């Protein structure tokens, strides 16, 4: 089964990705630092959840682009 994330994490992560798409990468540690710089998070756990979800979204986006490129090539 998948991970369950609260709406605050998903909403915040999507908003940050929409506003600053080039600042985030597939690296969790990098994303954690960027999240800390961009927003004031009350707890370390919440910051890590947001950074983890952003990392997940970037990986999914990268996989989707690879599949699209592969389909175009064929």
From Swiss-Prot:
NCBIfam families: PRK01151.1. This is Small ribosomal subunit protein eS17. Belongs to the eukaryotic ribosomal protein eS17 family. It comes from the Archaea. Keywords: Ribonucleoprotein, Ribosomal protein. The keyword Kinase does not apply. The keyword Cytoplasm does not apply. Pfam families: Ribosomal_S17e. GO terms for molecular function: structural constituent of ribosome. One of its GO terms (biological process) is translation. GO terms for cellular component: cytosol; ribonucleoprotein complex; ribosome.
